């Protein structure tokens, strides 16, 4: 399987809430989902409150279907109180690379 759809999110946690945000993301229901091929959570090297998520999915439809479901919406609801400012979300078209976690 190859990732045909990419998704990137950058979020800023409320002061002192980044670890909680990261824990929720690393327990995300998308991790065991068969159509989610890449799910990478990282913290900014220059601002520990900024958290990045990079995802690779088998298709845009699979990503959309998953995030329209109850599990994903429940996760989003848990994340919202931990965030401050405007988060950025970007859809992407993967062209290659490597991931070993």
Indicate where each model-derived feature is located.
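Glycine-rich beta-strand-turn "strand-cap" elements at beta-sheet edges
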Residues: 1-5, 38-49, 75-101
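Short, well-ordered beta-strand segments in beta-rich or mixed alpha/beta enzyme
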Residues: 5-11, 40-67
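Non-catalytic surface loops within mature trypsin-like serine protease
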Residues: 13-15, 59, 93-96
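Intrinsically disordered, low-complexity acidic/polar segments
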Residues: 18-20, 50, 62, 98
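An amphipathic, aromatic/His-enriched active-site/gating alpha helix that lines ligand/cofactor pockets
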Residues: 27-38, 56-90
